Amino acid sequence: MSQAEMSTCSTPHTQRVFQEAVRKGNTKELQSLLQNMTNCEFNVNSFGPEGQTALHQSVIDGNLELVKLLVKFGADIRLANRDGWSALHIAAYGGHQDIVLYLITKAKYSSSSR
């Protein structure tokens, strides 16, 4: 692993950069970051200070493109936030019908492939 890759894998730094890209809704930056972290021990399902994962935050923001990207890189759609709400609960409550449909489709597909 190169020095640049090791600095990218620095967990506290990486977590901050990751959360900031999610907050900004910056899909290109997040995709680049996730692709560069494939060799890292980085958990896309880690919780931020608000008790949300990046997926939960993207659903709250109504950002379907970011939701799809996070799921592609392993975000767990069944994981609950600190209030016990899954991404699907948050999407339904927020009126994000496109995200609701996407999450239902992903849940149906993943449960049928078991």
From Swiss-Prot:
Keyword Transferase assigned: no
Positions in coiled-coil regions: none
Keywords: ANK repeat, Developmental protein, Notch signaling pathway, Repeat, Transcription, Transcription regulation
PANTHER family: MYOSIN BINDING SUBUNIT, ISOFORM O, PROTEIN PHOSPHATASE 1 REGULATORY SUBUNIT 12
Record's subunit section: Forms a ternary complex with the intracellular domain (ICD) of notch1 and rbpj/suh.
Gene expressing this chain: nrarp
Protein name: Notch-regulated ankyrin repeat-containing protein
Family to which the UniProt record says this protein belongs: Belongs to the NRARP family.
Function according to Swiss-Prot or TrEMBL: Promotes loss of intracellular domain (ICD) of Notch1 in embryos. By down-regulating ICD levels, could function as a negative feedback regulator of Notch signaling that attenuates ICD-mediated transcription. Involved in angiogenesis. May be involved in somitogenesis.
Domain of life: Eukaryota
GO-annotated biological processes: Notch signaling pathway
ANK repeats: 50-79, 83-112
